[in-house]
Amino acid sequence: MGTPTPYSAHSPRDSESSYFSHTSPPHGEHEHDEQEQSLLERNNSSHYGTPFDDPAVSTDSLRRYTLHDDGPAVFAAPPYQESEAASENTFRARSNGDKASREGSRAGALRRYGTRKINLVQGSVLSVDYPVPSAIQNAIQPQYRDAEEAFSEEFTHMRYTAATCDPDEFTLRNGYNLRPAIYNRHTELLIAITYYNEDKVLTARTLHGVMQNIRDIVNLKKSEFWNKGGPAWQKIVVCLVFDGIEPCDKNTLDVLATIGIYQDGVMKKDVDGRETVAHVFEYTTQLSVTPTQQLIRPQGNESTNLPPVQMIFCLKQKNSKKINSHRWLFNAFSRILNPEVVILLDAGTKPGHKSLLALWEAFYNDKTLGGACGEIHAMLGQGWRKVINPLVAAQNFEYKISNILDKPLESAFGYVSVLPGAFSAYRYRAIMGRPLEQYFHGDHTLSKRLGKKGIDGMNIFKKNMFLAEDRILCFELVAKAGFKWHLSYVKASKGETDVPEGAAEFISQRRRWLNGSFAAGLYAIMHFGRIYRSGHSIIRMFFLHIQMLYNVCQLIMTWFSLASYWLTSSVIMDLVGTPSTSNKNKGWPWGNEASPIVNNFVKYGYVWVLTLQFIMALGNRPKGVKIPYILSYLYFSLVQLYVLILSFYLVVGAFNGGMMDFNFDEGVGTFLSSFFSSSGGGIVLIALVSTYGIYIIASVLYMDPWHIITSSWAYFLGMTTSINILMVYAFCNWHDVSWGTKGSDKAEALPSAQTKKDDDNKQNFIEEIDKPQADIDSQFEATVKRALTPWIEPEEEGGKSLDDAYRNFRTVLVCLWVFSNLLVTLLITATGVDKMCLTNTSTTRTSWYFEVILWITAGLSLFRFIGSLWFLGRSGILCCVSRR
């Protein structure tokens, strides 16, 4: 075939260098290492700061491998190569949608390259090493590249494997392997990033944050584990699992190609007719791209340099949902690598400083810890500007309170009901067996194999349960027969994630969360008996029973929350606004005559807007009715504000003697009797303190009070909204078990691989294009340009149609829910059901119900607070004795 002709090289041009000095538009990311930023500022002579080539090489060699080579001469392609090249070019042109790229691809089809024979592993597995661009090779520090134990191809070649099998069949026996296992390295920590269609900014935020965390681990000075038995970086593997070629953002692939873990044009659609299920790339890199499209590379021997990071990139050919991505992670890659701890991250979640180390330390110091999670907080933007948006502010407050009250309480019991898939960790040997088996029942790709036990054989309740599959995994882990695994919350580990900023997106997200958590919560309660088969101690079992009772109480309160919010609001309006002997015949705030009238109009509006929610929710199109939803948010928020003002007025009036005053003059007993009277303001005061007061006290104790100042207003005003809009929409769409994502199975643009027999007719091989290094470097420059260009937000896609059978179940569920809440309301407030109740007047029944609701609310809040205090004290003690 011949060798390529010599080609000219030239020095970097200033105009080209300046092209990469830009930063992307703001995208909620405003922080990165000062050290790394300084490296970029003082190295601006080329796209990578300075040429990557080894300074020891000659000038000619240096010129030959800069990023600005013109490329080799053009040749004609051989006949057998034309179709393959055309397929590759079609994929690249479709991926980029860029005229210049398409023209370059057509020019590339005219080149005539040599070929090489690639023997298939065990005659069926295609696994090939491809040279990486010279710039990436020479970015590796000499101390790693030239080390005695270094493998020659680890830093010079990217490994590609076409997996034509199910994840369960990705085994050593079938000829599949991974580099860390080939190099006989122990994998202590496997960090997995699952991806659907996130843009390159979100992906870079997560990946760069992970690499910074790995640097924190490698730079540990005093460690009992990481500094023994080989370099720390060799014990860590980062695995990216992308859910399908078609939904994948092609700019994100350019970012991965820039750091060396991906190359365009090497994927094969099938091997001898066997369809490729996943494309697996492997490389060890020291490069990273920041969310602001800045390239980070090593500089000398500074401690701020990123260490080598072993990466596995799994690009699934078809979109088959997140749970299938986890099956590739746990059943394919983890079985070969056998890691001790697996950390799960979603693309877009940025781990905080030393957060991954804190998660790992929790497992290292507690041998019975099966799973853990860190604190997830909302991304608020530069200067916390996003808290101006009430939806973002409310979610920020919700996340914070969950991390201060709920997670510590559950951690104290040993069973955290949900370890969020966006930021959690598991001990691999703890989830092996039944936990993973039950977890993967929700994988659509296993439906034929599992039959009735699979997703196609499930009823609608179980399908909703798998919208919160991480809750199922948590329960199965704690209930694992014969073991005593427990779950924990790690306060020192923090992750930042973006949250929905629009009403339609927020409603769709909460539909999945609420329905999934409700179904999974019932599942855990109904299968609680399996806890007795576990190996937990008697003390742990006792506390698990207490937690189960707490969860049952919370579930009941959630079910009847629709009636509770209505009754609470109407009772407070009547107590303050309707003149009576209890308030000394003073109607407030509109006067004796106007206050009852205004309150009635508020109530009628409440019922009308609530009815509107059912009508809109049954339409299943929140994006199509944005304005009515926004107006509904506004109305319920105003009602909540009005009720809060009346509540505080009620309490203040009780203290100053203006209305329903407390008796301070006749002893403690009389005061307590007046304070806890069902017609007094004492119970309202207890309810207010048990919610708002505990939120403030707990936040101060955890030294994280800022959300109280910046975000509490949105959360408190939106409490009614969360029930009347979000829960109504969720239950009315119980039949919809989709994730709201639209998958695609398109991969026609990829070329196929056809095997041939050697002369002895024994060994199967394929003929592969053998590109010269110069061409690889030339094409790489265009990739870098695409990777470092500003990000453009893609347009959103529409929803999907729903099944009629699921609509029927949905209708029955909604009717049952509404009827039960309506029945409670009628029994409490109606005047014609005296004989059915314990009292003879509706006023007495209403006061009694009001008192019970407030006491239960106060009790649950106090219970969460006690658990939070216990966790805080225990964490302080363990912090003094923990090991690394």
Swiss-Prot record:
The chain crosses the membrane at residues 513-532, 556-576, 597-617, 635-655, 681-701, 708-728, 812-832, 852-872. Its main location: membrane. It comes from the Eukaryota. Its EC number is 2.4.1.16. It is found in: Cell membrane. It is a multi-pass membrane protein. GO terms for cellular component: cell septum; plasma membrane. Disruption phenotype: Reduces drastically spore production and leads to strong retarded radial growth rates. Increases the resistance to echinocandins. Leads to resistance to AFP, a small, basic and cysteine-rich peptide that exerts extremely potent antifungal activity by inhibitiing cell wall chitin biosynthesis. It holds the Pfam family Chitin_synth_1N. Residues 37-48, 84-93 have a biased composition (Polar residues). This is Chitin synthase E. GO terms for biological process: cell wall organization; chitin biosynthetic process. InterPro entries: Chitin_synth, Chitin_synth_fun, Chitin_synth_N, Nucleotide-diphossugar_trans. Glycans are attached at N44, N301, N840. Residues 95-105 have a biased composition (Basic and acidic residues). Keywords: Cell membrane, Cell wall biogenesis/degradation, Glycoprotein, Glycosyltransferase, Membrane, Transferase, Transmembrane, Transmembrane helix. Polymerizes chitin, a structural polymer of the cell wall and septum, by transferring the sugar moiety of UDP-GlcNAc to the non-reducing end of the growing chitin polymer. Plays an important role in septal growth or maintenance. Mediates colony spore formation. ChsE and chsD seem to play a functionally redundant role in lateral cell wall chitin synthesis. Involved in resistance to echinocandins. It catalyses: [(1->4)-N-acetyl-beta-D-glucosaminyl](n) + UDP-N-acetyl-alpha-D-glucosamine = [(1->4)-N-acetyl-beta-D-glucosaminyl](n+1) + UDP + H(+). Belongs to the chitin synthase family. Class III subfamily. Residues 1-58, 73-108 are annotated as: Disordered. GO terms for molecular function: chitin synthase activity.
